[in-house]
Amino acid sequence: MMPLLDKLREQYGVGPLCSELHIAPSTYYHCQQQRHHPDKRSARAQRDDWLKKQIQRVYDENHKVYGVRKVWRQLLREGIRVARCTVARLMAVMGLAGVLRGKKVRTTISRKAVAAGHRVNRQFVAERPDQLWVADFTYVSTWRGFVYVAFIIDVFAGYIVGWRVSSSMETTFVLDALEQALWTRRPPARSITVIKVLSMYRWPTHSGLRKPDYWHQQEVQATRMTTRWRRASMVFTKRR
């Protein structure tokens, strides 16, 4: 507000401007005096100005990720005696905030379910396209939280034929990745798609999948596969 009054005071005068803003002219002149004579400010105001510089220094030296608690503790380690509430108040005035740590996400939910038998016996080799599909389910930590990714790879060419990203660990978006692969590759009818049951949740029946017209004769069965990595994975095999 003060820069605006300084800009318009020559044109309209201090009195009319303060009247429109419902403030006393003495308030404006008092602020002007404090700006031009910092030594005449109150002891608390002068200390706040000094603390702001120290807070800004600690904040910048720590990659601008420290919050109130860590800034306060760092100031105490440096011998600067200040209350935590004072640091919180000044950081709010300065518009400084620490980076929030995301809450811990439970990535594996074990459930007792009947596991299907093996179909490929870890022989991840294909003689032709769309003979064997390998799918995986993983998660990525971002500033906004966890993002879950499901993708399906054709073993013959190592090409991703379907993928989906979701902010929640639900089965529907994994089915969407499978459906995208089916629409993209359009495998021949009467082929068998073999799906591994995810360890994070129970794989549903294929009745929940929206079937395209050309896929009405396909049969979906479940199988189980163990990978070298401790993460969920799936296998899709197609038979001529």
Swiss-Prot record:
Ranges in a coiled coil: none
Domain Integrase catalytic: 125-240
Gene Ontology terms, MF aspect: DNA binding
Matches recorded under Gene3D superfamilies: Ribonuclease H-like superfamily/Ribonuclease H (3.30.420.10)
Domain of life assignment: Bacteria
SUPFAM superfamilies listed in its UniProt record: Ribonuclease H-like (SSF53098)
InterPro entries listed in its UniProt record: HTH-like_dom, Integrase_cat-core, RNaseH-like_sf, RNaseH_sf, Transpos_IS3, Transposase_IS3/IS150/IS904
GO biological process: DNA integration; DNA recombination; transposition
Keywords per UniProt: DNA recombination, DNA-binding, Transposable element, Transposition
PANTHER family (alphabetical): TRANSPOSASE INSF FOR INSERTION SEQUENCE IS3B-RELATED, TRANSPOSASE INSO FOR INSERTION SEQUENCE ELEMENT IS911B-RELATED
Function in brief: Involved in the transposition of the insertion sequence.
NCBIfam families from the UniProt entry: transpos_IS3
Protein name in UniProt: Transposase for insertion sequence element IS3411
Source organism of this protein record: Escherichia coli
